[in-house]
Regions:
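C-terminal accessory/regulatory regions appended to core domains
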Residues: 1-85
């Protein structure tokens, strides 16, 4: 598996902190849209690099996609929590 740069990991930590601190559904929706946009962009990059034969870069993008998919799950969990309140 390819490594992910420290800057990206720090961004993911900050992003996940935002999810956990979010106190309303409207703000959570903004976070969700940013996450989905990032996921879409990374997947497009993955497809492009993979089709061009840059498998190391493609693997890196796929690894980053996995982080954003995990964040999607956290967003869903936070939404469930906020809906119950």
């Amino acid at each position: 598996m390819s490594s992910v740069d420290n800057e990206f990991l720090m961004e993911m930590m900050d992003f996940n902190d935002e999810v956990e601190m979010c106190e309303d559904l409207a703000s959570l929706q903004i976070i969700r849209e940013a996450n989905e946009s990032g996921l879409s962009n990374l997947f497009e990059e993955f497809e492009r690099y993979f089709s061009e034969g840059y498998t190391d870069i493609a693997a890196n993008r796929l690894t980053k996609c996995k982080f954003l998919l995990q964040t999607r799950e956290r967003i869903d969990q936070r939404e469930d929590f906020l809906t119950v309140l």
